[in-house]
Amino acid sequence: MLNRRTFLKNAAVTAAAAPFISTEEILNPVPRHIGLQLWSIREDMKKDPKATIEAVAKMGYREVEPFGFNEGKLFGLGYDEFSKLLKDNGLTMPSTHSMMTSKNYDAGKNDIDDDTKKVIDNGAKYGIKYLIVPYMADEDRQKMDTMVKLYSAAGKYAKKAGVRLAYHNHEFEYATKAPDGRRIIEWLLQETDPAELAMQMDIYWVAFANHNPLDWFRLYPGRWELCHAKDVAKTEKRESVEVGDGSVDFKGIFKKSAQAGIKHYVVELENYVTTPLEGVKRARTNLLKMF
């Protein structure tokens, strides 16, 4: 039974969010963090970030995941202005993508460079919980010793700042092997400290590489604190489509969310049957049916 304090606290939270929450969600709340990777609607964001963010909020999203956080601005807006835009629409950005390469590692000091420290510090300032490396550059894939040291050093610095470093996969981490014969994903999971590097599993790319996400949940439980949710089309090209419109068993995958450690479910869309905004709206609606 709820005590009075808890009831009043919950009521206050609901009231504050009321302009952005549908009646259905109030009656049937989904206690999960469901967000949108803004790469999915990047052209709309470039044209009119204000109107686009308003549209995203009206769809029912509560979290967004920007990209290019290391570039100093987000969609032409300073961090203060972008943060206010989100707040005005009942949105938060608990995670963001921010590129990091071997050039950001100082081997002599076994540390990250000042630019990377500044990015992490900005993340902490603006409430980022997860700073996510979105990609490993081609030239860095044969330097796994260096990349592990980079992520470890960045993870240590981020932890002190109150931010969690994470890595986002594509297909190649599951297909490409490092010089010692291990897959790149195995290097990252086996050679880094879980306290210093979390993982954001892109379910589409894992399935595209003909791997089963459940196998990786079982082998490395608790490492997958975020996921990108997009489906594999039932076509010869196997392009990405909205969650629920392809061949991936998301219901089966999400039943093991606790084992995986998933805290944030992030919708992403890279191919469009209709428009980007219509696509991410459909993807969210479909995603809610997978729990």
Language model regions located:
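Conserved acetyl-CoA-binding loop of GNAT-fold acetyltransferases
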Residues: 61
